[in-house]
């Protein structure tokens, strides 16, 4: 699978692995469930308050997003990025609630590694089974004759791998699936369509909501009949502006870091994050006195990642449905996790 290599370096890494005690996994699982619950409370407050401007979302889409939430459109999956050293409470760095990647590695590949390299051991990994269950729940909500479409920028190998894996999981749940590139989706005046002109009634998209809202066809989202996975309301949680909003709502929570819309709220070192940044893009470590940027950014207290053998380690804690489902670890020699950071497996000691 060629997306496991970036710049000639393997993305999947077996040079190391992480051993967790059952108690440590219990801590991560509980923190993940707690954080997801806090995030849902934040969505409810934002929807009821109608104040989505703080998330740099155009007002045109506010009602549409709110209706998605009030219909209980399903949120299939997401990934919290957590800083955890085994002693202090896990800290939420962000929530990749819209287009999380490293899914195939976390759900399947590290499980095969466990069976081959650590037979007899266990792993916190129910991701695959939970995804099948969630797709079965989707199946119960829709017309059984509908086909589920899967889209993204499919000439990107990692996106293609993730989309094809998710399509396979969907088909294991008993639904018909079909993949097509985002550029191949058309519009017939009332529906988004596939290349054959068939209406797309259900669409799994590995394509960020903020990108979709900026496309020329964005107004069609408001009138089309397509059900999207992830649902429109999930864009509130993948937005870094949710971090200061969570801190305002739950100040001092042990799993949250102080965060603000104002750089001046931090006198010492902090982290600047672009509201719509992904895979480490738009993340900058600021020293005391550094002014930073004023353009659609938030600021978060610095929480250094634990370092093992000169590698910074971050935990990706997966949510499937509304429950913690498993973890994956990524390492990087730099303190900011990015697209080329390697994936490292784990097991329970």
Residue locations for each model-derived region?
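Preference for protein termini
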Residues: 1-349
């Amino acid at each position: 699978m060629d997306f496991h290599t970036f710049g000639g370096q393997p993305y999947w890494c077996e040079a190391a692995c992480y051993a967790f005690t059952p108690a440590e996994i219990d801590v991560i699982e509980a923190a993940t469930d707690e954080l997801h619950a806090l995030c849902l409370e934040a969505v409810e407050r934002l929807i009821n308050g109608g104040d989505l401007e703080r998330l740099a979302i155009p007002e045109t889409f506010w009602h549409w997003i709110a209706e998605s939430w009030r219909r209980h459109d399903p949120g299939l999956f997401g990934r919290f990025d957590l800083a955890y050293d085994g002693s202090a409470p896990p800290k939420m760095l962000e929530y990749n609630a819209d287009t999380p990647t490293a899914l195939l590695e976390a759900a399947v590949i590290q499980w095969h590694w466990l069976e081959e390299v650590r037979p007899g051991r266990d792993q916190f990994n129910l991701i695959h089974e939970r995804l099948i269950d969630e797709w079965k729940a989707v199946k119960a909500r829709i017309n059984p004759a509908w086909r589920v479409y899967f889209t993204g920028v499919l000439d990107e190998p990692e996106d293609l791998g993730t989309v094809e894996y998710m399509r396979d999981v969907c088909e294991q749940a008993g639904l018909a699936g079909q993949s097509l590139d985002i550029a191949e989706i058309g519009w017939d005046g009332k529906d988004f369509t596939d290349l054959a002109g068939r209406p797309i009634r259900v669409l799994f998209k590995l394509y960020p909501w903020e990108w979709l809202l900026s496309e020329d066809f964005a107004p069609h989202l408001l009138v089309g009949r397509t059900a999207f996975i992830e649902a429109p309301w999930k864009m509130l949680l993948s937005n870094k502006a949710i971090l200061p909003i969570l801190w305002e709502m739950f100040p001092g929570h042990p799993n949250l870091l102080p965060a603000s819309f104002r750089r001046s709220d931090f006198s010492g070192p902090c982290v600047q994050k672009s509201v719509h940044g992904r895979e480490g893009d738009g993340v900058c470590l600021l020293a005391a006195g550094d002014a930073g940027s004023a353009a659609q950014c938030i600021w978060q207290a610095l929480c250094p990642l634990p370092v093992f053998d000169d590698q910074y380690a971050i935990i990706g804690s997966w949510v499937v449905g509304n429950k913690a489902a498993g973890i994956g670890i990524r390492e990087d020699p730099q303190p900011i996790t990015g697209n080329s950071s390697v994936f490292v497996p784990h097991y329970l000691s």
